[in-house]
């Protein structure tokens, strides 16, 4: 069904450019650039990675007057076909979301040398690919410091989608930040795993309760759509708090999500789309950290009073030290 939706969407765009394109060109004097995005599994509504990516291109569509379409694959096996579909349909930029896109994009990109591609959280060394990476350790260090200051048990938790080096960078930064402010801290880590690690809220809720039963009172979830299970767990347990990831999840359970480590996929995609429109988009690796506007904490909208001005000032000071280089998150 999703392939049919994509096909119909592409067909409508081709019909538009074939039939109504002359009128558009007469009105604006220029052709709209087309951007297609293949989301990661879990799709929209994850309040995390995919939602952030979508928000960035929606903003780019409004500000740069581009055509924008997206597709939500049901499984990893569909990634390559959807990337190929967009490129074959003549899209100017095809965006691949997530590290699992690396292998499919390596196969597709060389077949379309005149099409520009961008991939988030992976490196594809092709002359027509922009690889977008984030210094997630910096943001995880920040939220780890929040957890280290706020825990009442000196025990905090981490839930990852799978146990792999890329995701463990989040865990490592989180541990380092917690230890930076609280030398007595213990961090317990569990992983969702299974056949759909980034879209299994039931398993993430089970792991959240297991961590709670082992004294963890704050849990950082880095598991895409599975993280909804963590949010459900904190909503049902008065003495359990969450830290969100990728998008601002603070409002999902007001007052129970201390902060969110915002990996600003939205800002990165907005930036490279602007470069595309200006004819300045180049291939290669782009790294977005706190200093580059690619990483931040959320605004503590619902937890300012709970955390308190003194701790918030310490968190701000840590951020400034990271930007200046005084604190280096290795």
Predicted regions and their residues:
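Positively charged n-region of N-terminal signal peptides that target proteins for export
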Residues: 1-5
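Core hydrophobic alpha-helical membrane-spanning segments
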Residues: 7-13
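C-terminal motif of bacterial Sec signal peptides marking the signal peptidase cleavage site
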Residues: 15-18
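A residue-level marker of the well-folded mature domains of exported/periplasmic proteins
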Residues: 22-330
